[in-house]
Amino acid sequence: KTTLLKLMLGGLQPTSGTVEEGTRIDVAYFDQLRHQLDLEKTVIDNVAEGRDFIDIDGQSRHVLSYLGDFLFSPQRARTPVKALSGGERARLLLAKLFSKPANLLVLDEPTNDLDVETLELLEEVLLTFNGTVLMVSHDRAFLDNVVTSTLVFEGEGKVREYVGGYQDWLRQGGSPRLLGVTESKSARPT
């Protein structure tokens, strides 16, 4: 799935066929390894690049106020990224991505390392995002909370689109066995 995202974004070249890009697409990409973060810079400098104010949805915001939306205190915002936990780095990457103008948000396993507060924040931000979100996630409950359409790779080159999230796909006749998933009580979303 990550390879497919990289192919679609031009990070990998296909071995056959072509990938055709749309026009006027501004992509923000959340990679599960968080490569877009500069570990030596502070949280503030990763987002604002030396500025005190940043433009968010056409409005000027003080960077500390904006980072507060992503649960960073002013003191923590001055911390080098290398000192942050995995969850804090994920929050920072989200803050950085949502500070850039984009109409296509690509998320590769965005819920890895997230605490409950950050997961709720991510859900809220995604629900208000004014664009298209393309996401790879194994977090079925998260998908049920935020997606309106699901692409399912059903094997033998078949990809189908279903309205809604994981539970909606099951109600529409989807089978976890089709995906090689064993559904146990503990694996089911609650």
Predicted segment positions?
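ABC ATP-binding cassette signature C-motif
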Residues: 1-190
